[in-house]
A protein has these predicted regions:
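Cap/insert and terminal regions of metallo-dependent hydrolase folds
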Residues: 200-204, 210-215, 221-321, 325-326
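Binuclear metal-dependent hydrolase catalytic cores
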Residues: 2, 26-215, 221, 304, ...
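Sec/Tat signal peptide C-region and signal peptidase I cleavage site
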Residues: 20-26
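Bacterial N-terminal signal peptides that target proteins for export
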Residues: 1-11
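Bacterial N-terminal signal peptides
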Residues: 10-19
Length: 331
């Protein structure tokens, strides 16, 4: 009897060791343990304003206890949500970091398809000033289609009764039983002079859940406010940009040659001052004492899709884990 008990104990210990080993391996790949209630999927990982065959534009979804929270909705967001196995009719909360089209171009499609899924509960979109205007414009764009579908008898609830935009400022902008979301204004638009100075807002978001803290930089240059927001985060999803790769890509496809000198100067000013470089990301992550950096919003490289050198550059200034996001990657 004692031998059987010893054998059972040995077996249980072995199973526990295997389980812990599997959990450790999963976490080393940026995947939380099966016990975690929070999941992040990077839906779209390309920077804009171009399109790419391998990556959709910026979009993410955080899922907490089965509730989905979308962060940005660039072109391709709805398709990627479907590919991730998420029913669009279950999307109820969307956060927009700023109003560049590579972060919002897919919002209207996502809204329309969610409505077509017989969604009747409100869908709320939170973001910088003019988010309410953006949502109303998207509703108006699909108004003719919605009118026809209602006339066909397939829908009865007007699309305008489902979607609501909310202009928010810095601070805690949303909270429920699963999550608390805090926003700070970042420096993505801080370089503007003249009449445009201070007119447009770009936000970074901190998501606090029962088991994780995830911070999305959105598009930003260096920013003390974002560094403070990111303190102690489990995941820092950082926009990643290369002004030289961006310029070379535009030269290769002819856009650069089609620009006036002032347009070229404006593009490069925005690319260098309104975005972080790899050194900036590493230093921010170190100062904020984050655990893992996820590089996303990736500028298209010329002649290669290998971003390993970018991760290595960040690691020169940050001792934690650095991961390169791909579309539909889970963390």
């Amino acid at each position: 009897m004692q031998n059987r008990s010893s054998l059972l104990l040995t077996t249980l210990i072995s199973i526990s060791v295997i389980s812990l080993s599997h959990e450790s391996m999963a976490q080393s790949r940026g995947v939380p343990s099966p016990k975690a209630v929070t999941r992040l999927i990077t839906l779209g990982t390309a920077s804009g304003p171009s399109t790419r065959p391998d990556r959709a534009q910026s979009s993410n979804v955080v899922t907490v206890n089965g509730t989905h929270y979308v962060v940005d909705a660039g072109d391709g967001a709805a398709r990627r949500l479907a590919e991730a196995g998420i029913d669009l009719g279950e999307i109820g909360i969307i956060f927009v970091t700023h109003h560049h089209d590579d972060h919002t171009a897919g919002l209207g499609t996502l809204m329309s398809l969610a409505w077509d899924r017989q969604r009747t509960k409100p869908i709320h979109v939170y973001g910088p000033p003019r988010t309410e205007e953006l949502v109303k414009a998207a509703v108006q764009y699909f108004a003719i289609s919605a009118e026809i579908r209602i006339a066909d008898g397939g829908r009865t609830v007007p699309i305008a009764q489902v979607f609501f935009g909310h202009d928010v400022g810095s601070g805690v902008i949303y909270q429920d039983a699963n999550i608390k979301v805090t926003a700070v204004e970042n420096s993505h638009f801080a370089f503007h002079d003249g009449p445009a100075s201070g007119k447009y807002k770009s936000y970074s978001y901190r998501f606090e859940t029962p088991d994780r803290v995830i911070v999305f930089t959105g598009d930003t240059g260096t920013s003390d406010a974002v560094t403070e927001l990111a303190k102690g985060a489990d995941l820092l999803v950082a926009e990643t940009s290369s002004s030289e790769d961006r310029k070379q890509a535009m030269i290769n496809d002819g856009r650069w040659q089609a620009m006036t000198p002032s347009e070229q100067a404006g593009i490069m000013r925005q690319a260098t001052q309104g975005h972080m470089n790899l050194v900036d990301i590493g230093k921010m992550a170190t100062r904020a004492n984050v655990k893992t950096v996820v590089l996303s919003h990736l500028t298209q490289r010329v002649g290669t899709d290998d971003y390993t050198p970018w991760a290595e550059e960040v690691k020169k200034h940050f001792s934690g884990q650095v991961l390169i996001a791909k579309d539909l990657m889970r963390f």
